[in-house]
Amino acid sequence: MVTAVLNHHQRAGGLVHRLRKQQAHDWRLKCRPVCASTELELSHWLQSVPWRGEFPRAVLADHQTRGQGQRGRRWEAARGGVWISAALPWNSSSGHADMLGLMVAYALCERLEQAGLPVRIKWPNDLLIDSHKLAGLLPRLVFRGGRLRMVRIGVGMNVANPVPAGAIALRDLLPPGCARREVWTVEVLRALERIQTLANRPELVRREIEKRLWAHQVKDPQSGEIWEIQGLALNGALQLCQGARSASWTRWPDANHDNLYNLA
């Protein structure tokens, strides 16, 4: 049964009702009107109430003042969007988690495509529509005793919030009344539930993600070289070629840091 835990925010009751109506998993939810970061809130929750792995947990915020992004980037998440940090149990029967962020991206694409939206996946963790950023993901794997026990996923999706240049919100894309934060919060949680099913079908996930990749070429920000995108490896690495040369990126190269990719 979905429950709201240690929560005095009226939003929680509506979410619990919607999730129960859809026969969702047994989520434990915390909703905050405002917080520095849902990632930090989730970490504190996992520390104060030790993880036993029975139920997935999620922290949701109306407004984040210091949201966490890739490589420690900080950003402010305004009211009107979906800002979630979730922890889900994972065990040996849950399948492979190598493509965790991409699996979440694909699961979100499925939900958005049902609304008629032409979503593209910008490797590794962003969702784009018409080259504008709609959502970003922050995946993490948590090991205990050398075994994967938990996956953590942060999701930020622009719904009815103001967005900066280069971004887009669902309210700009959907008919009036269809870009409701409560509805899309449930859609995100349902997408997170789907990843364990997808983890047992890695070839399917790879094929479907490759169909939705945002571009055919990428530019290396360090060298300025243009590489052709060939597809994905089963571990989620981006496979590239340039004439007779090939490369595999395991993360996006940074112009100020060493690349984490292999050349051949």
Positions of PLM-derived features:
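N-terminal lobe of the biotin/lipoate ligase/transferase fold
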Residues: 1-114, 232, 260-264
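Long, positively charged amphipathic alpha-helical accessory segments at protein N-termini or as interdomain linkers
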Residues: 1-12, 24, 91-119, 129-264
